[in-house]
Amino acid sequence: MEAPAQLLFLLLLWLPDTTGEIVLTQSPATLSLSPGERATLSCRASQSVSSYLAWYQQKPGQAPRLLIYDASNRATGIPARFSGSGPGTDFTLTISSLEPEDFAVYYCQQRSNWH
């Protein structure tokens, strides 16, 4: 069995909103997976954020890259293996079959609206 290439680290983010503090909790904290496997990452909001949820990927020394916006829409140039679901309080980012370049940090972000 091939050893996992790397770990996916997730962050816990607190983001203010006009209605008060919204806490986004990502799980699991880490995933140990190999290329070709399926990755499922969860983000739970302490109150409904409708569909205003985005997923980002970040690699060392690079700026965050937008993957998914409005819960389920892929950003320009993002491969179809990335998909998102929502809305409400429970969101999921799925990578259907991991490629070596997918091993990175992933995090979710809530915004009250998009500008």
UniProtKB/Swiss-Prot annotation:
Region (Framework-1) location: 21-43
Region (Complementarity-determining-2): 70-76
Example of a GO cellular component annotation carried by this entry: immunoglobulin complex
Signal sequence bounds: 1-20
InterPro entries hit by this protein: Ig-like_dom, Ig-like_dom_sf, Ig-like_fold, Ig_sub, Ig_V-set, IgV_Light_Chain
Subunit structure: Immunoglobulins are composed of two identical heavy chains and two identical light chains; disulfide-linked.
Job description of the protein: V region of the variable domain of immunoglobulin light chains that participates in the antigen recognition. Immunoglobulins, also known as antibodies, are membrane-bound or secreted glycoproteins produced by B lymphocytes. In the recognition phase of humoral immunity, the membrane-bound immunoglobulins serve as receptors which, upon binding of a specific antigen, trigger the clonal expansion and differentiation of B lymphocytes into immunoglobulins-secreting plasma cells.
Protein name as catalogued: Immunoglobulin kappa variable 3D-11
Source species: Homo sapiens (Human)
